[in-house]
Amino acid sequence: MGIADGQRRRSSSLRTQMFNKHLYDKYRGRTDDEIELEDINESKTFSGSDNNDKDDRDETSGNYAAEEDYEMEEYGSPDVSYSIITKILDTILDRRRTFHSKDGRHIPIILDHNAIEYKQAATKRDGHLIDERFNKPYCDNRITSSRYTFYSFLPRQLYAQFSKLANTYFFIVAVLQMIPGWSTTGTYTTIIPLCVFMGISMTREAWDDFRRHRLDKEENNKPVGVLVKDGNNDAQEVYTLPSSVVSSTAYLTKSAAAENNPPLNDDRNSSQGHFLDTHFNNFELLKNKYNVHIHQKKWEKLRVGDFVLLTQDDWVPADLLLLTCDGENSECFVETMALDGETNLKSKQPHPELNKLTKAASGLANINAQVTVEDPNIDLYNFEGNLELKNHRNDTIMKYPLGPDNVIYRGSILRNTQNVVGMVIFSGEETKIRMNALKNPRTKAPKLQRKINMIIVFMVFVVATISLFSYLGHVLHKKKYIDQNKAWYLFQADAGVAPTIMSFIIMYNTVIPLSLYVTMEIIKVVQSKMMEWDIDMYHAETNTPCESRTATILEELGQVSYIFSDKTGTLTDNKMIFRKFSLCGSSWLHNVDLGNSEDNFEDNRDNTNSLRLPPKAHNGSSIDVVSIGDQNVLDRLGFSDAPIEKGHRPSLDNFPKSRNSIEYKGNSSAIYTGRPSMRSLFGKDNSHLSKQASVISPSETFSENIKSSFDLIQFIQRYPTALFSQKAKFFFLSLALCHSCLPKKTHNESIGEDSIEYQSSSPDELALVTAARDLGYIVLNRNAQILTIKTFPDGFDGEAKLENYEILNYIDFNSQRKRMSVLVRMPNQPNQVLLICKGADNVIMERLHDRELAAKKMADICTSTKERKDAEAELVLQQRKSLERMVDEEAMARTSLRNSLSSVPRASLSLQAVRKSLSMKNSRTRDPEKQIDSIDQFLETVKKSDQEIGSVVNKSRKSLHKQQIEKYGPRISIDGTHFPNNNVPIDTRKEGLQHDYDTEILEHIGSDELILNEEYVIERTLQAIDEFSTEGLRTLVYAYKWIDIGQYENWNKRYHQAKTSLTDRKIKVDEAGAEIEDGLNLLGVTAIEDKLQDGVSEAIEKIRRAGIKMWMLTGDKRETAINIGYSCMLIKDYSTVVILTTTDENIISKMNAVSQEVDSGNIAHCVVVIDGATMAMFEGNPTYMSVFVELCTKTDSVICCRASPSQKALMVSNIRNTDPNLVTLAIGDGANDIAMIQSADIGVGIAGKEGLQASRVSDYSIGQFRFLLKLLFVHGRYNYIRTSKFMLCTFYKEITFYFTQLIYQRYTMFSGSSLYEPWSLSMFNTLFTSLPVLCIGMFEKDLKPMTLLTVPELYSYGRLSQGFNWLIFMEWVILATTNSLIITFLNVVMWGMSSLSDNTMYPLGLINFTAIVALINVKSQFVEMHNRNWLAFTSVVLSCGGWLVWCCALPILNNTDQIYDVAYGFYNHFGKDITFWCTSLVLALLPITLDIVYKTFKVMIWPSDSDIFAELEQKSDIRKKLELGAYSEMRQGWTWDKDPSTFTRYTDKVLSRPRTNSRASAKTHNSSIYSMSNGNVDHSSKKNFFGNSSKKSSERYEVLPSGKLIKRPSLKTQSSKDSIGGNITTKLTKKLKLPSRNVEDEDVNQIIQARLKDLE
């Protein structure tokens, strides 16, 4: 017990609240039995229905606080140890402490607030229940995701501002400056600007937080219905129920429907006449008889003890104790996807004793009970409490335990239940989801700020050094020239030591610019707006643009090393799709949803049948989304009445148009409208599984001939009596029978008369039932044990047939059994019962009647799979070693083969090799074609591609197929050369064949002998399972068994006894189920796709290429997480997956062994999978945690499943703390991701369909995961480069300018005199050098976005801090110092020592000033800035021209005749001297020339990655490839609606033809390119988009996807360079990691044509 007690953190609460203790004890092998409330709860029948993943949830935990939480645990009243000073500090700093009561919180369950018991527990003033810990009312239900309060903003912001070292430095200087007699520049010239600049920064931060407050207000003001028993009601407060509840206040459950036996589960049949008038949902009865009204309250107004009424699809506003509900068996379902990431619905039940009281209206109105619950805590998976009811018979109090099945938490959604009444037990910040959020999120600061602070420290040291140096010079000159009355006219006056030193410090202190941070704030505001205005990151479906809520850390978007992503709703689309199935040894693709997916949103929005560009073309077709109703499109694809070639499908002209659709309602239900049709089954090309399927598996290259359900249904309709057709129909029937879905017929006229809503707690079953409907087996109704199915025996166009099946028993699925069974009495088999079982492949295979054969085949498949994966891994390792040798053979030999996977950021090996290869080429020639050739040579030798991995897969599977041909004979379908032999005679069947297309189907199916060959079917089925699993699909194996009626009845008695047993019920039920689930016959396999969002796989692959490690942290179960890992390519086919569990005997040895293997380079790709229970164990052991973190930093990826929100935050914090220079990014969409988002350096929220919880607290929000690519690779890189260049240019100009002051002191005996005129000196940073640094900080783009997206390896520039570091800073300091020396000394020599007109301070300073202003402007805008445009020229003209105007205006400001002759010197003296102008010109040009020569020499000798690709992207052929590679990311911006005249003016400019101003001419010209009315592109080759120009123009130019016109290479030039550059296109395609297929001209032309259409 000592060990267990040591694990407890809240030992005196109602329960320990330490579920880590249970896990730790379980891990340590504790066997002593303790009786706890949870054990009692599990022994009762009322504890809730069996949940598939309950055991997994009980093992998962996360009882810890992330490091940012400031949490203090006290028991009893806080007044004892909670001092007044601590309270004040907590209020000011907005710190939150957690206190605990001695025996839990006691809450009366009373609807009548006038009852004596309620008044005793409530305050007299407002009637709110009292929190015993504070003797104050419980907190309200307001939540706050903002970072500051009214009281905490000022102290926290002052801390944040003075953490910027420059502000601290200037504050000290300002204090010294205000000391009388010390300052020579005024008293308040530093403190006032400092306060203004800090005020601007604080105002911007206040505005950002104000927006968060505004979003909080939106959620806090949501309405909810509250039951109130009060005679005085305000009519305006009465809550209006949803129409669905008003129309059917008494929703009939399955049991009620069985009693009334209606023909359908129809809402209209659930009328007032069928329900119990005393039921709680008779709201009229509650109102009229019991004076219970439904009031509308805002969420924030809810208090503990309120009775909340929820209706279907409502969000749960607070943590509620269930009182009653109208679901079947008093059961309700909640979706907790936003809470813990689980996709399956959870079953919840009110306590049976409590439900007895509140089920009736009278009981609900008059209930008087009490509940004692635990104090607020972070444990999402456990709950403990006591229900106290009074026994009126003997006046005793009965206590009943409450468990997690009796409560529903905030962040959940009520599903499949009409009405629920619950009482608030935790509100606001004390709810579970808010307790898991960080209570005191830290103020985020960029990593670059730390470097800036160090540089400022260095500059302070420099200022102090040169100030002391100047003072030393002053002392020496004073002794030499002033002391001993040598300068008698000064009367030996001395200012003193301190004033003299301070004068130098004040003169030099602006080397550190005072406006540094405020200028950076202005730049970052513009940067954030440019991100928000990016149309490529706009999600049209949800109308969600990119939103920047924090401008402070913009540059960190370009430095990310780790990405932590949620799964549900972030990577996935929250949809389960029935994608593939295997039947009798042949695999089939179910692609019914591909033509009607949400990807058509843009097309449906305009209601036009338009073509959209695909991510990958197939078989020469570039159709990605096609409306099947467009016959023109079908004609172009060949689906018309024209003769059908081999391999093509028949025409759809005779098929009725599809009108079926599916409307998903979360993961709980789907409304299916319309009847099945052949047109609905018709899909696009076979290989298009979904957006992400194109990169799911390399096996597609071999499996591209897979047939679809369209082909299968057509075959069944043509040959209904064939053996395969009979088995297929039986398989479809099994899909429709073996499930627990509830069909509900709806009669919403707007939906359609044939619409049926399927409700299920499992999204997988929802996908199976909808697939059965697609295939012609419609689950129509369920009444008691009768399941009605509508079939179409004569085809979808024929008359439907209703069949009734009696469901005798359900054997439910759970996490131990991993299978589900249903026993059915078939209509035509009265003496037999059909058992249909579905489950995991290993579970079903070991229960087949020939299990030995299945086991042998499974072993063979496993061996083959292992050999294939080993071959793939070996290929990857060889490629990596070759890559390392090419970079640096000697250096890499001394380092680990896996050093690129360590936590220390490293450069891309591919780019290093490219640079080395190009440098070797450059030593001989600068031929660009040889540059490309060198890149291609490098990639061909060492770079892995999907085709090479695919070739390994194909070779392995072809070898297996060859063995099958040798074993089963040449008439097997995979041979493809022999006609299969079915029951129908060959000659007869050949006469019935109309097309060769039928032959392909028959060859795919195989002969009857093969279909009946059990060994063959099992082998092919296991092979299909392997292929499906590799693609990341969730597989289920179906099996069946016929049972004699007598055998069934005997078993049913035993099964009934097990279900009614009072002891060990669960074990006995499982044993009885296992008894009947034996000796099964294999039926088929289904593969369900957890649909990823568009572009997720491609995005993750590019993220990996960028050198960013991606982790997936999810609350879902392990199997689901691993499947998604395969789907999104987080786990490769050849990956070594290391699973860490609490059952591992020596887990630390296991982790060390894996770490050593990774270090040795023997693992090609390593992924660690860990669950929440194991993480909880690691938390209690620092040694385990340190070893685990070290292992994770070496692996390629980590998947953490069953993770609580706090555990997600802990994982992020642990990695963030390993290296302070690493930048972490967390992305999620739900409330369970808030803590993770706040813990990371950068938090990105997905503002999607499931609410704005994560988006509200995030730093940046986007609509889809794929937008992360442009956010990081383009805007992140630009922001990092702009900020770095701004910092460098700022320090450069300050050092260049103020070092001239130091040099000039030698000519003034170090007197502290300034070289420059005071007004000019004060305006230097404001008027003459602010624009160039602002422009480079706002608009710098070193490379084009298409280059950055196509070559993600370039992202390492920011990740490795190559844009701003000490080396680069010192390089700029040396350049600035050199220029200062050149300018000042040459000025003295050329003007000061030779001028006869005026060689005083004023002209010397004027020449210096002119040269420095010109140098800074030209260097910033033309030397350092890559995208030179009109803004660069404008800023230079304004700055330099403004300085000249200023010089002319200075005499007006200084109109008095003084020795310092400003008033007349320029016009009357040196301004007329040609030497002055020549000196100014030479000093302005010479430093600029030296800078240009230095930069050119550097680019030629040591080119950076940016230099290489900046040159390559200027070439037309390379730009074309780059645009094609980035088309999917930039398509929206390129194809967005634009002004047609823009393209007209552009083409006029390129073609050098006269511009026309006639609108009619422009309209005619545009109409000749494309048609705006119907949105269709004219593909006619006769169309000339160059208007009235000659055909030579169209032959000379082509249009890129971006709309840019480029010249076509001439045929003569192309042929002459065929030997050298003929393969440049192919080579560059490999380099840029474009799709693996060859980019054919017709594909490019289709992109161009679509681009021309979208330019309208």
Curated annotation (Swiss-Prot):
Subcellular localization, as worded in the UniProt entry: Golgi apparatus, trans-Golgi network membrane; Endosome membrane
Positions on the Lumenal side per record topology: 1-164, 473-495, 1179-1318, 1387-1395, 1454-1473
Keyword field: ATP-binding, Endosome, Golgi apparatus, Lipid transport, Magnesium, Membrane, Metal-binding, Nucleotide-binding, Phosphoprotein, Translocase, Transmembrane, Transmembrane helix, Transport
Modified positions (Phosphoserine) in chain numbering: S627
Stretches assigned to the Cytoplasmic side: 186-451, 517-1157, 1340-1365, 1417-1432, 1495-1656
Region (Disordered): 36-74, 1554-1576
Binding site for ATP: 566-568, 765, 813, 815, 818, 838, 1034-1035, 1114-1116, 1167-1174, 1202, 1208, 1232-1233
Domain of life, source organism: Eukaryota
Record's catalysed reaction(s): ATP + H2O + phospholipidSide 1 = ADP + phosphate + phospholipidSide 2; a 1,2-diacyl-sn-glycero-3-phosphocholine(out) + ATP + H2O = a 1,2-diacyl-sn-glycero-3-phosphocholine(in) + ADP + phosphate + H(+); a 1,2-diacyl-sn-glycero-3-phosphoethanolamine(out) + ATP + H2O = a 1,2-diacyl-sn-glycero-3-phosphoethanolamine(in) + ADP + phosphate + H(+)
GO cellular component: endoplasmic reticulum; endosome membrane; mating projection tip membrane; phospholipid-translocating ATPase complex; plasma membrane; trans-Golgi network; trans-Golgi network transport vesicle
Membrane topology summary: Multi-pass membrane protein
One term of GO molecular function: phosphatidylserine flippase activity
Disulfide bonds: none
Needed co-factor(s): Mg(2+)
Extent of Basic and acidic residues compositional bias: 51-60
Pfam families hit by this protein: Cation_ATPase, E1-E2_ATPase, Hydrolase, PhoLip_ATPase_C, PhoLip_ATPase_N
SUPFAM superfamilies (alphabetical): Calcium ATPase, transduction domain A, Calcium ATPase, transmembrane domain M, HAD-like, Metal cation-transporting ATPase, ATP-binding domain N
Entry EC no(s): 7.6.2.1
InterPro entries in the record: ATPase_P-typ_cyto_dom_N, ATPase_P-typ_P_site, ATPase_P-typ_TM_dom_sf, ATPase_P-typ_transduc_dom_A_sf, HAD-like_sf, HAD_sf, P-type_ATPase_IV, P-type_ATPase_N
Family as reported in the entry's similarity comment: Belongs to the cation transport ATPase (P-type) (TC 3.A.3) family. Type IV subfamily.
Protein function: Catalytic component of a P4-ATPase flippase complex which catalyzes the hydrolysis of ATP coupled to the transport of phosphatidylcholine and small amounts of phosphatidylethanolamine from the lumen to the cytosolic leaflet of the trans-Golgi network and ensures the maintenance of asymmetric distribution of phospholipids. May be involved in transport from early endosomes to the trans-Golgi network (TGN).
Subunit structure: Component of a flippase complex consisting of DNF3 and YNR048W/CRF1. Interacts with YNR048W/CRF1; the interaction is direct and required for proper expression and endoplasmic reticulum (ER) export of either partner.
Protein name: Probable phospholipid-transporting ATPase DNF3
Species this chain originates from: Saccharomyces cerevisiae (strain ATCC 204508 / S288c) (Baker's yeast)
Name of encoding gene: DNF3
